[in-house]
């Protein structure tokens, strides 16, 4: 057996648990297939696949139908010619502490950890792999109910702009890569549930549980993903602030965010409009398409707000009671007002002193 291959199968193995692996000092290496990595990965991890999807499927089939020995033999025959190349892709990280993971902490991550250790790397395996990480994340999210200051207001009022500028905030739309509206995916690549939850955990796991957090009022679903149930409950019970701005201001802010930059974007927007025929009627949709092609974007946005967004918002929020109402015409002033409201909040559970 060649030395590289022998080390791949029989080298030393060091392993750690999820909480240790997530320390900033670790560089995470995901040796699963690129398809697995895309479907869900630990944020910040680098994908260095040991097999491609077809190879993994073949090895898994052998394991189930013939047995472990046959699967290992086949996997070894696939890996052997590529070990030198695989090693070279990781050489740039040799000075770092590496943590290798696969799906469940099985042969893929064990073999790579042994191999890299024999080649002089500081390396350890993540016990339980990505499955253990997911369990760790979900355990946290199922119990994460922080005190929240929830910003409400009609579309275009500036909620997202404020969330991005406020200290101690969570930008759910950024984590989801979706603006939580029918046009919310324009210019963005929405994330799936697993990656959203991983990023949500990374953003929140170190926050003090008693400290108020700013968040934008959302429904349970943001684009393709669902907000964790415990956090959604915290949003319902949080301090609610209503932001107000003129139609002119709202139109301007929406245009800055969504402005059609090319023909592809215009085509996407027009395609989405077709889905509104039932709620707006054919005539209004055709009017909107005409305005879009005439580059009359301000008129286009105004009609959408008046006939679609505002009525839906009023219906969904009519039973809400707000702790505070603020003008959002001047966002710098609104930011100062919100920070003042935040500073006035006592320890979680006591009544606010702000007036």
Q: In which residue ranges do the predicted regions lie?
A:
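Flexible, polar/low-complexity N-terminal or interdomain linker segments that lie immediately upstream
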Residues: 1-43, 137-154
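Positively charged, proline/Ser/Thr-rich regional signature most characteristic
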Residues: 22-92
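Catalytic cysteine-centered active loop of the rhodanese-like fold, especially the PTP/DSP P-loop
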Residues: 73-127
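Glycine-rich phosphate-binding P-loop
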Residues: 108, 147-167
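Long, charge-dense
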Residues: 125-138, 255-259, 269
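Conserved nucleotide-sensing/catalytic segment adjacent to the nucleotide-binding pocket
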Residues: 167-234
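Conserved NTP phosphate-binding and transfer environment spanning the P-loop NTPase/kinase superfamily
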Residues: 234-239, 244-355
């Amino acid at each position: 057996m060649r030395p590289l291959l022998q080390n791949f199968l029989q080298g030393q193995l060091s392993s750690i648990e999820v909480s240790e692996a997530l320390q900033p000092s670790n560089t995470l290496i995901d040796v699963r297939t690129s398809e697995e990595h895309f479907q869900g990965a630990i944020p910040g991890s680098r994908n260095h696949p040991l097999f491609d999807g077809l190879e993994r499927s073949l090895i898994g089939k052998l394991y189930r139908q013939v047995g472990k020995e046959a699967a290992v033999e086949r996997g070894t025959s696939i890996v052997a010619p590529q070990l030198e190349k695989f090693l070279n892709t990781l050489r740039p990280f040799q000075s770092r502490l590496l943590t290798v993971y696969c799906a469940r902490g099985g042969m893929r991550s064990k073999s790579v950890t042994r191999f890299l250790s024999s080649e002089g790397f500081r390396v350890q395996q993540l016990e339980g792999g990505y499955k253990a990480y997911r369990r760790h994340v979900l355990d946290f999210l199922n119990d994460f109910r922080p005190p929240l200051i929830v910003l409400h207001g009609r579309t275009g009022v500036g909620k997202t702009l404020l969330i991005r500028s406020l200290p101690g905030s969570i930008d759910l739309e950024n984590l989801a890569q979706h603006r939580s509206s029918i046009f919310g995916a324009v210019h963005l690549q929405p994330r799936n549930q697993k990656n959203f939850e991983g990023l949500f955990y990374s953003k929140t796991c170190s926050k003090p549980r008693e400290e108020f957090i700013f968040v934008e009022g959302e429904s349970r679903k943001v684009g393709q993903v669902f907000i964790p149930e415990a956090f959604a409950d915290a949003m319902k019970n949080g301090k609610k602030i209503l932001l107000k701005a003129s139609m002119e201001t709202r139109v301007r802010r929406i245009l800055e965010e969504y402005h059609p930059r090319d023909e592809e974007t215009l085509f996407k927007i027009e395609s989405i409009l077709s889905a509104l025929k039932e709620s707006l009627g054919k005539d209004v949709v055709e009017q909107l398409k005409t305005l879009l092609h005439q580059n009359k974007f301000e008129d286009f946005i105004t009609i959408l707000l008046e006939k679609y967004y505002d009525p839906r918002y009023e219906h969904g929020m009519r039973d809400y009671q707000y702790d505070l109402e603020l003008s959002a015409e001047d966002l710098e002033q609104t930011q100062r007002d919100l920070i003042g409201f935040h500073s006035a909040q006592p320890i979680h559970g006591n009544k606010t002193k702000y007036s």
